[in-house]
Amino acid sequence: MSTTSAQATAVVTGSFLSGAMISLSLMAVPVLLDTTTEPTQLFFQWRRMYHYGHQVLPTMAVATTLLYAYTASKRRRAQKPSWAVFALAGTITVSMIPFTWLCMVPTNNVLFGLEAATRLGEPSGMGIEEAQALLVKWSWLHFTRSLMPLMGAILGSLGETVWN
């Protein structure tokens, strides 16, 4: 694969990744909030949305990062200073994974716990407003995480012009 092709593919996959992620916060979560009247249903729907996102999005982040790493490696071997921009683009893109572990896991665990409890018929102990507030918190964290591959794509697209 040529370096230019790897760079272009990384930018496209990073942009697609960010768009797919942002659509969850900007479209899917608002639909859940507008159409769900019971905490049990809200937790179940969130878990399904999380499940499908988890199937695809982390893998895309790693693949995008590997494409940036390949581009950075080829540029470095060619002694082009722009290699550092591509290395940074990859690092920023994959930083969504440790962000998830450090910032989102507590909220995720609460949501997973509430979904599991209500699935077993136990009361959640919260009304719909509290459940919605928890989902809004998750949505803002997820939106923040979604910006990381976007920042990587912006850097990746400007790589040669930023530092050549």
UniProtKB/Swiss-Prot annotation:
Topology in the lipid bilayer: Multi-pass membrane protein
EC number: 1.10.3.-
Underlying gene: AgnL2
Keyword Thylakoid among UniProt keywords: no
Protein name, UniProt field: Anthrone oxygenase AgnL2
InterPro entries linked: Anthrone_oxy
Presence of the UniProt keyword Transmembrane in the record: yes
Species for this entry: Paecilomyces divaricatus
Subcellular location field: Membrane
Membrane-crossing residue ranges in chain numbering: 11-31, 48-70, 85-105
A Pfam family it matches: Anthrone_oxy
Taxonomic superkingdom: Eukaryota
Top enzyme class: oxidoreductase
Cross-referenced PANTHER family: ANTHRONE OXYGENASE ENCC (PTHR35042), ANTHRONE OXYGENASE-RELATED (PTHR35042:SF3)
